[in-house]
């Protein structure tokens, strides 16, 4: 133990209350003065709050800040201004600035052929607008008129150069209809291993109960006909991710899995990635756009899974770190090359 620590040990068990009881009123007042927090740099505070008391005299009266400011302002107005050492005579020195006159440019007289003179004399506003666009005079018209005249082979500017250009009328695009999938019927078909059901698409259905999604994953364990399973934007969390992981360990027919845009955390993604290692039929996996960033450890696990699973040729995730991104790109290139060689055979 150093000497400094030994000195600190002396004051560790000191009772502050006992020390304060032994102090006299004068000593307590001095201690209170030392512990006061002052702000000497704040010019908006009165002097009494910017420094400690320098005297023991009692105040002659209460502090009236407004009266003090009025008194200082009145004193400042009553002080006479100092006379200038050199009186101002009003003499002007130097020459005033006179702007030089600019010469008006003379327009050149251009003589055209009689045929062009006659064509321009009888040209309409729409034709003049197209001619100006072809000659590159884009300052005489709007961008819409200019590009319409350049891109179109016919006269399309019927309004003229100086007219008000109307905006294009766009066709209203209706919203996409809701997902018409009946969850109960899909669950029955998956349980009965219906050979006509090869795709389960529950995208954008956000009111599916978690127990029903868990039952669907449980039914997928023994299904041999479903090739694509998509749960995009279904508000699925870690319980659903764990059920998907259990399904991947037993299912041997699923080829595409999409669980993007959900509430799956890094724990749920890690469980899915570990289960992908035990699945040899999955070729496409998409896990991007979760509620929270999974972390560096999950991204490294993704790169490792892609390196160890040559069956995956499509992977949907936006890496934030350069190392896992480069490893995943190399693994995907290798997996696609292996798939191409297998097709040749």
From Swiss-Prot:
A biological-process GO annotation: myofibril assembly
Stretches that traverse the bilayer: none
GO MF annotation terms: actin binding; tropomyosin binding
Keyword tags: Actin-binding, Cytoplasm, Cytoskeleton
Domain of life: Eukaryota
Ranges for region Disordered: 42-63
Listed InterPro entries: LRR_dom_sf, TMOD
GO cellular component: cytoskeleton; myofibril; striated muscle thin filament
Subcellular localization(s) per the UniProt record: Cytoplasm, Cytoskeleton
Function field: Blocks the elongation and depolymerization of the actin filaments at the pointed end. The Tmod/TM complex contributes to the formation of the short actin protofilament, which in turn defines the geometry of the membrane skeleton.
Family, per entry: Belongs to the tropomodulin family.
PANTHER family the record matches: TROPOMODULIN, TROPOMODULIN-4
Binding partners and assembly: Binds to the N-terminus of tropomyosin and to actin.
Name of the protein: Tropomodulin-4
């Amino acid at each position: 133990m150093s000497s400094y620590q030994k000195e600190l040990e002396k004051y560790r068990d000191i009772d502050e209350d006992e020390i304060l009881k032994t102090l006299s009123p004068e000593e307590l007042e001095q201690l209170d003065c030392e512990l006061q927090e002052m702000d000497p740099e704040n010019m908006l505070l009165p002097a009494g709050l910017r420094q400690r008391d320098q005297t023991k005299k009692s105040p002659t009266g209460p502090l009236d800040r407004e009266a003090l400011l009025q008194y200082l302002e009145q004193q400042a107005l009553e002080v006479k201004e100092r006379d200038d050492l050199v009186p101002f005579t009003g003499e002007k020195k130097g020459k005033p600035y006179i702007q030089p006159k600019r010469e008006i440019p003379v327009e050149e007289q251009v003589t055209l052929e009689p045929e062009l003179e006659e064509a321009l004399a009888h040209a309409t506003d729409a034709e003049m607008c197209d001619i100006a666009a072809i000659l590159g005079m884009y300052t005489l018209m709007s961008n819409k008129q200019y590009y319409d005249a350049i891109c179109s082979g016919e006269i399309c500017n019927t309004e003229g150069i100086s007219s008000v250009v109307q905006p294009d009328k766009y066709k209203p695009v209706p919203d996409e209809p809701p997902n018409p999938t009946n969850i109960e019927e899909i669950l029955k078909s998956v349980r009965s291993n219906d050979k006509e059901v090869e795709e389960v698409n529950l995208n954008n259905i956000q009111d599916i109960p978690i127990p029903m999604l868990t039952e669907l994953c449980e039914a997928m364990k023994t299904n041999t006909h479903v090739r694509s399973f998509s749960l995009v934007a279904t508000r699925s969390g870690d319980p659903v991710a764990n059920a998907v992981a259990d399904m991947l360990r037993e299912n041997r027919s699923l080829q595409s899995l999409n669980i993007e845009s959900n509430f799956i955390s890094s724990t749920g993604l890690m469980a899915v990635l570990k289960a992908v290692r035990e699945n040899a039929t999955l070729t496409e996996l998409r896990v991007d756009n979760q509620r929270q960033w999974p972390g560096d450890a999950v991204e490294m696990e993704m790169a490792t899974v892609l390196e160890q699973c040559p069956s995956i040729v499509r992977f949907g995730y936006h890496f934030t770190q350069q190392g896992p991104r480069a490893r995943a790109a190399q693994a995907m290139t290798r997996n696609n090359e292996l798939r191409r060689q297998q097709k040749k055979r």
